[in-house]
A protein has these predicted regions:
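A bilobed periplasmic-binding-protein/Venus flytrap-type ligand-binding module shared by bacterial periplasmic
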Residues: 212-215, 274-288
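Ligand-binding "clamshell"
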Residues: 259-271
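Aromatic- and charge-enriched surface segment that lines or borders ligand/interaction sites
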Residues: 91-136, 152, 158, 241, ...
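Ligand-site clamp/hinge motif
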Residues: 186, 215-260, 275
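Gly/Pro-rich hinge or "lid" segments in bacterial periplasmic/extracellular proteins
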Residues: 172-222, 226, 236
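N-terminal lobe/hinge region of extracytoplasmic solute-binding protein
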Residues: 46-97, 128, 193-194
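Short, well-ordered beta-strand elements
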Residues: 41-49, 101-104, 123-126, 157-158, ...
Length: 288
């Protein structure tokens, strides 16, 4: 059994208080992906509806529903548990002598949820779309050095940069750079179609979004049959939902509420350091 782990942040409040945001999950639930066992069980988690009516399933937009897109769509490259860049939909990659061109070989036999094949044209479409000024994607900075993506063949792409960049593959681990079917930009916000382990059965940003296991997932069918992502805007209500069994996991719990779960054998508190940081902006034209 693998327990869900989530990110942990520290930030200052009123110059003195440190708030630790902690995620809790039920110990007894199996959430590991496994092709050895049939998909079974329903896992329920919450989101805060932070983008309101603009909440959608398009990973490159400001209103993306993070909890869903990470389960329905894949990237080319990801980080493993040690933080090392590793293959996802790209099997391997290499740069030229001055690191201004990067060639990525793509995984073969991968299909989108609509049954279409994943190929190099989808990669070019998905990533160049991030640069579209009409979309105004918050992720466009990750693609700012890319001037062109050449489709070498059906499962090879060459990305051309405007400068040398030895760590370019690391940029592609950006959680927003997900692969979608070529030409699906107008509908992806509602369908969420990708190559991931779960398929969107029903999208309801203000209610419950239902995901079903993808039996044809390229890493093997997930261990869960369904995931329900429930909108609960109020933080206190999310904690109560966890305590009463309405949800199985809450990604962030204020430090002051951590004591509710300490010593409770039904819950596991996972504190996971990350590279995230929070800045505090201060005026410099007036005295403290």
């Amino acid at each position: 059994i693998k327990l869900l782990t989530c990110r942990f942040f520290k930030e200052r409040k009123n110059m003195k208080n440190i708030i630790k945001l902690i995620s809790v999950s039920l110990i007894s639930l199996l959430v590991a992906f496994s092709s050895a066992n049939a998909s079974s069980g329903v896992f329920k988690l919450s989101h805060d509806l932070g983008f309101g009516k603009d909440t959608n399933l398009d990973a490159i937009t400001k209103g993306r529903l993070f909890q869903v897109v990470i389960m329905t769509q894949n990237r080319l490259v990801r980080k493993n548990l040690d933080g090392v860049t590793s293959p996802e939909l790209a099997t391997d990659w290499s740069g030229n002598s001055d690191a201004t061109e990067w060639t990525f070989n793509l995984r073969k036999g991968v299909k989108f949820h609509d049954g279409s094949d994943f190929d190099a044209e989808d990669v070019k479409y998905s990533l160049m779309r991030v640069k579209d000024p009409d979309i105004g994607s918050p992720a466009k900075k990750s693609m700012s050095s890319v001037t062109d993506i050449e489709v070498v063949d059906s499962h090879t792409v060459k990305m051309k940069l405007n400068t040398s960049f030895a760590d370019f593959p690391l940029l592609l681990t950006d959680y927003r750079l997900r692969m979608i079917p070529s030409g699906s930009g107008d509908t992806i916000g509602q369908t969420g179609i990708g190559t991931g382990p779960f398929i969107v059965e029903k999208f309801d940003a203000e209610g419950t979004t239902i995901l079903k296991a993808n039996p044809d997932y390229w890493e093997g069918a997930p261990g869960l049959a369904e995931v329900h992502v429930i909108a609960i805007p109020d933080g206190e209500a999310r904690v109560q939902a966890l305590l009463t069994g309405q949800i199985d996991m809450n990604r962030y719990v204020p430090f002051a509420q951590k004591k509710i779960f300490d010593g409770n054998s039904k819950f596991n508190v996972s504190v996971v350091p990350t590279g995230n940081w929070r800045g505090m902006v201060m005026r410099t034209d007036t005295a403290p």
